[in-house]
Amino acid sequence: MSFDFIKDKNKHIHFIGIGGISMSGLAEILLYNNFSISGSDMNSSPITEKLKDKGAKIYIGHKKENIKDADLIVYTAAIASDNPEIIEAKEKNIKLMDRADFLGNLMKGYKYNIAISGTHGKTTTTSMLSHVALKANVDPTILVGGNLDIINGNVRVGESDFFITEACEYKSSFLKFFPYIGVILNIDADHLDYYKDLDDIKNAFSKFIKLIPKDGYLVAYGEDKNIQSIIKEANCNVITYGINSGDIQAHNIEYDEKACGNFDVVKDNQKLFSVKLNVPGKHNILNSLASICIGLASNMKDKDIIEGIESFFGTHRRFELKGCKNNITVIDDYAHHPTEISATLDAAKKYPHNKLFCVFQPHTYSRTLTLFDDFTKCFDNADEIILADIYAAREKDTGIISSDMLGDKLRDRGLKCTNFHKFDDIKNYLIENAKDGDLILTVGAGDIYKVGEMYINL
């Protein structure tokens, strides 16, 4: 690991938005290497408390006074230009670096950077691969967009040349990375507040492919038509995977009673080995194939790949079993794009249940608006839909779109759908209507998981 771009270990580095999952991971890597770290966030959280315990100075709220001792400031794409700490840094000529630039510079210190991109499945695949790499004893540094039990958080600092990270396409952040193995899980229309259209998104992924060196590897889902159209841009080794085609395929797929797949891994019509997943759905078969391809490209042993895949039981907020109450199961999932919701509901439909309640909180006004038609068609596997208000995240409500409008369209299609504006009202509705053997699935990237926790903790 090298921190040459920072120049001086005595420097004080300040993170604006330090409570974010990626920012906190970067801060933790630097704390491990004895840098002086501070950071600000709008709210205290278990993440900020953990960083404080590790030696970071944490400020709640954004104020210009927070950066008085900083030599370098790292900020996220979600931080507005009128943030008082950004303004103060510019006035004082303190160096500013966005999160993607910082992570990209950090990656320069590693030889085997594995960057996992795609519209869906990045966190799960990064986590699954992390299990494989740890079983193979390659001692990787890991930065993942969720909490992973095997590393007790979202970051692990290793001593080898292996660095495993997610590569997010939002605002073309992943184009600042240095992948030796670049992974594309899928390409779908998303982040249309930044990208003009799907072709614009595909163009960004095409540029990502060109970042991979000639002796490196592109691992890609070969049955995705959007990937097929850009894979020719690769000037490196290419490994494709899929169910019915690709260099590495899944054959003889069977699902257990909880929708977890087991299958044979096949190359050139020859069986390599079999694996049994402990995460549900077809989408996780594809995620596991990507992890298997990376393991094979990295010369990991079949035994370690199998054990790593089979030891993975998921990450927090990815089809996470929250608990059972009165024989009613509560599961939470981070799905916030129509494609993800369809995949999650498909897995839930295979899960043991009588009636399936889907409690959905749309994430951002821009996504709800630009993908509105797709949102009206992705809930068909739910027996009943409960909609919360849109989670704004980095956006402001312009009054153009609302959950009520989505609910109206779903009801027009003949689906049973109810809108609520308060979590307490959702909880009370579930208390009255969920019965023995039912399944409650909370879905969304905001704070809808709290509804499930409220229900479980009655």
From Swiss-Prot:
Pathway: Cell wall biogenesis; peptidoglycan biosynthesis. It is found in: Cytoplasm. SUPFAM superfamilies: MurCD N-terminal domain (SSF51984), MurD-like peptide ligases, catalytic domain (SSF53623), MurD-like peptide ligases, peptide-binding domain (SSF53244). GO terms for biological process: cell division; cell wall organization; peptidoglycan biosynthetic process; regulation of cell shape. Its main location: cytoplasm. It is an enzyme of class 6 (ligase). It catalyses: UDP-N-acetyl-alpha-D-muramate + L-alanine + ATP = UDP-N-acetyl-alpha-D-muramoyl-L-alanine + ADP + phosphate + H(+). GO terms for cellular component: cytoplasm. Belongs to the MurCDEF family. Cell wall formation. This is UDP-N-acetylmuramate--L-alanine ligase. It comes from Clostridium botulinum (strain Langeland / NCTC 10281 / Type F). The gene is murC.
